[in-house]
């Protein structure tokens, strides 16, 4: 698969409340340099560049962060920094990106990446991501990256895996949002649960088809926005 066919979409619309007081609405953690060097969104883009090209990146953010993100990531075309007029959680942001790319690059593979991840082994991460891209390209699959839980964490969502398809590749049985402590401990003990990383990979067509099926009330509005984008 060529680099040009993979489009990373960085989700950077957080309000900055969970990292308060260091993080604020206009200084959310994704635009902060917590290590004193690169900001989290800069690290996210750098981590993904071996698999994509700068001109193929998209960012979904809000009006308070858009200007600073464009300053920090000047290589991304301004029209590809999408500003949400109102925060409506993740699904509409992902949906808008999907419909925009369906129009501009219908054969593309799309990856959705939170802007605030810390990943220690980036080489291994890219290896797993490359495999996800290949699977999404050859199959009509939505691929989600799971993380082996290190503890019974109540702050993350969990993925319950079902049948094994290939080495380290499983069907998803169900998603569970942030559980209480008891359930989190049960998940870790069971051995077939993973933390939900929030990283998804799919073809543009697979994504938009799923949106039309499962987000039917919102989809027409997203399609209208995508059709008018850049006009």
Regions found by a protein language model. Name each.
Residues 1-10, 17-25, 33-114, 118-126, ...:
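Conserved N-terminal catalytic core of the sugar/cofactor nucleotidyltransferase
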Residues 112, 144-146, 196, 201:
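A structural signal for short, well-ordered beta-strand segments and their strand-loop junctions
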Residues 45, 49-52, 73, 105, ...:
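Structural signal for hydrophobic packing residues in well-ordered secondary-structure cores
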């Amino acid at each position: 698969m060529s680099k040009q066919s993979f489009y990373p979409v960085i989700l950077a619309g957080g309000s900055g409340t969970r990292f308060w007081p260091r993080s604020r609405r206009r200084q959310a953690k994704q635009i902060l340099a917590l290590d004193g060097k690169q900001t989290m969104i800069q690290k996210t883009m750098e981590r993904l560049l071996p698999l994509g090209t700068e001109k193929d990146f998209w960012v979904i953010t809000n009006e308070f962060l858009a200007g600073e993100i464009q300053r920090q990531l000047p290589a991304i075309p301004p029209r590809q920094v999408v500003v949400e007029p109102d925060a409506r959680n993740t699904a509409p942001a992902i949906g808008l990106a999907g419909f925009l790319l369906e129009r501009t690059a219908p054969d593309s593979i799309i990856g959705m990446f939170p802007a605030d991840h810390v990943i220690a082994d980036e080489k291994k991460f890219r290896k797993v991501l490359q495999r996800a891209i290949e699977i999404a390209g050859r199959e009509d699959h939505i691929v989600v990256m799971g993380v082996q839980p290190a503890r019974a964490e109540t702050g993350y969502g969990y993925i319950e895996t079902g049948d094994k398809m290939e080495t380290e590749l499983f069907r998803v049985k169900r998603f569970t949002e942030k559980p209480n402590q008891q359930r989190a401990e049960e998940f870790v003990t069971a051995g077939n649960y993973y933390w939900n990383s929030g990283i998804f990979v799919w073809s543009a067509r697979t994504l938009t088809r799923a949106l039309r099926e499962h987000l039917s009330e919102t989809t027409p509005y997203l399609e209208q926005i995508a059709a008018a984008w850049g006009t």
